[in-house]
Amino acid sequence: MALDKSVILLPLLVVVLLVLGWAQPSLGRESRAKKFQRQHMDSGSSPSSSSTYCNQMMKRRNMTQGRCKPVNTFVHEPLVDVQNVCFQEKVTCKNGQTNCFKSNSKMHITDCRLTNGSKYPNCAYRTSPKERHIIVACEGSPYVPVHFDASVEDST
């Protein structure tokens, strides 16, 4: 009788361990939508002309760990406005994919570019506040931005 129970329980235990092993790494993984928000959203502030803005933000948002991210853009608009871009003008992404969308109106952004000669761990960025249309890649359910593709001057 005890042998019968162990024959049933052993495969069940193996299945439970496999499921836990598969699910556990994804529990701590940041979703693409959350990563987009961490790397690109700064709704609570206006574009800064402070030369230290990008240096501070890139470090604060964990984009200088292990290497210096060469280019990044922060968007200074409400998250809902950026999410709504996913339902605006459809455009082709830089990589050829077809899930990119361009904002109907210009948005306040700050471009951060690694300065020439800057090397990890001393990442130094040039800060450029701008007003431009943004292009984002969207996916998921709900359909939300997961990648900042570009910013453009005009709407054409």
Swiss-Prot record:
<feature type="region of interest" description="Disordered">
    <location>
        <begin position="31"/>
        <end position="52"/>
    </location>
</feature>
<feature type="disulfide bond">
    <location>
        <begin position="86"/>
        <end position="138"/>
    </location>
</feature>
<feature type="glycosylation site" description="N-linked (GlcNAc...) asparagine">
    <location>
        <position position="116"/>
    </location>
</feature>
<feature type="binding site">
    <location>
        <position position="94"/>
    </location>
    <ligand>
        <name>substrate</name>
    </ligand>
</feature>
<dbReference type="Pfam" id="PF00074">
    <property type="entry name" value="RnaseA"/>
</dbReference>
<keyword id="KW-0378">Hydrolase</keyword>
<comment type="function">
    <text>Endonuclease that catalyzes the cleavage of RNA on the 3' side of pyrimidine nucleotides. Acts on single-stranded and double-stranded RNA.</text>
</comment>
<feature type="disulfide bond">
    <location>
        <begin position="93"/>
        <end position="100"/>
    </location>
</feature>
<keyword id="KW-0732">Signal</keyword>
<protein>
    <recommendedName>
        <fullName>Ribonuclease pancreatic</fullName>
        <ecNumber>4.6.1.18</ecNumber>
    </recommendedName>
</protein>
<feature type="binding site">
    <location>
        <position position="38"/>
    </location>
    <ligand>
        <name>substrate</name>
    </ligand>
</feature>
<comment type="subunit">
    <text>Monomer. Interacts with and forms tight 1:1 complexes with RNH1. Dimerization of two such complexes may occur. Interaction with RNH1 inhibits this protein.</text>
</comment>
<feature type="glycosylation site" description="N-linked (GlcNAc...) asparagine">
    <location>
        <position position="62"/>
    </location>
</feature>
<dbReference type="GO" id="GO:0004522">
    <property type="term" value="F:ribonuclease A activity"/>
</dbReference>
<keyword id="KW-0456">Lyase</keyword>
<feature type="disulfide bond">
    <location>
        <begin position="68"/>
        <end position="123"/>
    </location>
</feature>
<feature type="signal peptide">
    <location>
        <begin position="1"/>
        <end position="28"/>
    </location>
</feature>
<comment type="similarity">
    <text>Belongs to the pancreatic ribonuclease family.</text>
</comment>
<dbReference type="InterPro" id="IPR036816">
    <property type="entry name" value="RNaseA-like_dom_sf"/>
</dbReference>
<keyword id="KW-0255">Endonuclease</keyword>
<feature type="binding site">
    <location>
        <begin position="69"/>
        <end position="73"/>
    </location>
    <ligand>
        <name>substrate</name>
    </ligand>
</feature>
<dbReference type="InterPro" id="IPR023412">
    <property type="entry name" value="RNaseA_domain"/>
</dbReference>
<dbReference type="GO" id="GO:0003676">
    <property type="term" value="F:nucleic acid binding"/>
</dbReference>
<feature type="binding site">
    <location>
        <position position="35"/>
    </location>
    <ligand>
        <name>substrate</name>
    </ligand>
</feature>
<dbReference type="GO" id="GO:0050830">
    <property type="term" value="P:defense response to Gram-positive bacterium"/>
</dbReference>
<dbReference type="GO" id="GO:0005576">
    <property type="term" value="C:extracellular region"/>
</dbReference>
<dbReference type="GO" id="GO:0016829">
    <property type="term" value="F:lyase activity"/>
</dbReference>
<keyword id="KW-0540">Nuclease</keyword>
<keyword id="KW-1015">Disulfide bond</keyword>
<feature type="disulfide bond">
    <location>
        <begin position="54"/>
        <end position="112"/>
    </location>
</feature>
<feature type="active site" description="Proton acceptor">
    <location>
        <position position="40"/>
    </location>
</feature>
<keyword id="KW-0325">Glycoprotein</keyword>
<dbReference type="InterPro" id="IPR001427">
    <property type="entry name" value="RNaseA"/>
</dbReference>
<feature type="active site" description="Proton donor">
    <location>
        <position position="147"/>
    </location>
</feature>
<feature type="binding site">
    <location>
        <position position="113"/>
    </location>
    <ligand>
        <name>substrate</name>
    </ligand>
</feature>
<keyword id="KW-0964">Secreted</keyword>
<dbReference type="InterPro" id="IPR023411">
    <property type="entry name" value="RNaseA_AS"/>
</dbReference>
